[in-house]
Amino acid sequence: MLIACGMALFLTSCGAGDAPSFKSEAESTPAEDSIGERLFLDTRFSQYFAAHMTDVNQSLTAGDPVVAQVDTMHGPLPGPFAGQAINCRSCHFVTEFQGVTGAGNRTYSDYTTRSPIPRPMNGFTLTPRNAMHMVGSLQPHTGPTLLHFDGEFATPEDLVKGTLTGRNFGWAPTEAQQAIEQVALVIRKDNGSDQLAQDRTNGLSYSTLFKGTDPKITSDLLIPAADRIDVNTASDQQILDLVAKCISTYMGDLLFQQDELGRYIGSPYDVFLRINHLPVQPNAGETPAQYNRRLLQIVEGLKNPIWVDGSYGAFQYHPFPFQFGATEFAGLKIFLKAATSATDGSQHAGNCAACHLAPNFTDMLFHNTGVAQAEYDSVHGAGAFMNLTVPSLADRNNNFDLYLPASSSHPNASETFRRAPDASHPNYADLGLWNAYLNPDMPNPQTSIKALVCATTQDCSVDQGLGNTIAQFRTPTLRDLEDSSPYLHNGSRATLEDVVRLYIANSQLARQGLLRNAAPELRNMSISDEDVPALAAFLLSLTEDYDDA
């Protein structure tokens, strides 16, 4: 769905031709999207609900404590789902805390470093990582789609199934079948009587919606004939598959503001490009990298740019000005520029666009920018991560329970290398993509991961290839970063300035050969504290008024 929030749509008339004619919701939103939103918000799929319910259509007498409050960087807030059980929205918020100091809108992300899980298991009380924001995560792009910070899921449907039947919903690795049965039970027995069903699907039950033959179903809720199932005769797995498809469709339609041609229009940066008649996206046949180099050449030669100020609009959900001025412009040039034979931080060249390619501001790939090493060394001392013993492929896979993430085949695995560092456990670290690559319990993403690993290294032998995945994490989009703090896969940085300073430190380590498996792009980064304000201002200019209206 094309989300128009906050800023008026005059944006597209600023040097960009006629204003767009948006499709109507009925034309642009498939039925699976609307049904998927309801499923995304449904609180009845978790282990806690299964264990405490009296009837799928009755409220719980006591809610899951995990949703009683929401942890934020500024302290806890009352949970919007208190008295109920966990749902997808419990970690991927949007407008639940709109206008609340220290919280505000989110881009389908949370407010803290790592989210609490409903049921402690395998030593975990929190998720291993920060909740990556979902808006734009399924934006069309070249190359494979790999989801989660470590690429463990090859499709959004796989991600949904893994979530509904996994730890984040309170299910132990040995309880996957029970989780599937709970999803199927809710879908079969739901009668559409709760407020969520009234608001999202006109009070129709899931069984009615999935069958798709009732004349009361409006066109916007009518699932295509090829996808319909009779839940009374379908298998539990078939029901889960359709649930996953609906939620995945909903996820795929979570987009930042765009016009009818898919061009971004919602942020001060987007307005700046348009009013200065700058290219807003690659030309036909032009790669994103080529577009970014061309954009740099143009902005470096731009004379007398027109600045964006309050006359172009105002934020509805943010307390700072809607602006793109000289400081943001300087930050844009630093962001796009790559250093030449960098030996220090003096070139005002961030090389950020090597991974965060405009206009999406992500390459959807995996890189090690030193975040895991910084966290590990903060616990165990400088240089400790460089000396951490990481097993070979044979050693790792032959000792699955010792090293790899828990699964239904290995329910007692310790997940040594998908944990936050701990002073009492010196082997605990998060190695990112290393956990998924060549993992026999994660077969679906292997072809795509191997293609990426072998495309970026000359030596693609199994041990070298595995070594090249150490501490690599998926590149998030930088759009609307203001609404996804705290930042990075571990939520370790609270401000944009803190993130930039971390990259300054890690680029220095990379040039000195002191950053383990460093992304080569870091060596072409040459920035200093002098560049922090401009880069942070530019990143802030990617903010827009996102909501889920």
Q: Where in this protein do the model-derived segments appear?
A:
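Bacterial N-terminal signal peptides
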Residues: 1-12
